[in-house]
């Protein structure tokens, strides 16, 4: 949340609505249905991940400030089925040292970082490619 308002020099001027709209455009190209969820509450995110376990083919997650210490996200994602892509608008490795370690990365198929709003398209394309490769 607060995208487009908070630190636009880092996160850009696109709003959360803009990001979701772009992600839906890309998922529609591949014939997928996007289910978007945003919360500042880690427990709510865990609930969503656990509820999606057998209903979704993949999860693209931007853990934000939970990246270095969201161990409950790590555990929920580890128990998930399907593809997991970690995505960040900025590149955490170019920022403060406390942002450099991700507890999500070890359970993700891959990470897309530093591409702003384009990161969602890249993440969806990566998710699609992994699914296609698994179907071969």
Where is each model-derived feature located?
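Short acidic/histidine-rich motifs immediately flanking catalytic phosphotransfer sites
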Residues: 52-59
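Short, glycine-/small-residue-rich phosphate/pyrophosphate-handling segment
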Residues: 35-36, 85, 94-136
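Short glycine-rich anion-binding loops that position phosphate/pyrophosphate groups of nucleotides
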Residues: 1-2, 64-67, 90-92
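Short Gly/Thr/Asp-enriched flexible loops that form oxyanion-binding sites at enzyme active sites
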Residues: 70-81
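Short beta->alpha junction loops
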Residues: 33-43
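Glycine-rich phosphate/diphosphate-binding loop of Rossmann-like nucleotide-binding domains
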Residues: 1-30
């Amino acid at each position: 949340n607060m995208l487009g308002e908070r630190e636009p020099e880092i996160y850009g001027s696109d709003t959360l609505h803009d990001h979701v709209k772009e992600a839906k455009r890309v998922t529609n190209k591949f014939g997928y249905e996007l289910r978007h969820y945003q919360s500042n509450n880690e427990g709510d995110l865990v609930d969503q991940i656990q509820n999606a376990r057998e209903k979704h083919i993949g999860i693209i997650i931007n853990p934000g400030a939970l990246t270095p210490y969201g161990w409950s996200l790590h555990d929920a994602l580890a128990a998930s089925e399907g593809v997991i892509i970690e995505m960040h608008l900025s590149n955490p490795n170019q920022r403060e040292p406390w942002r450099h370690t991700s507890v999500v990365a070890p359970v993700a198929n891959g990470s897309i970082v530093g591409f702003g709003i384009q990161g969602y398209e890249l993440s969806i394309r990566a998710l699609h490619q992994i699914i296609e490769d698994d179907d071969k």
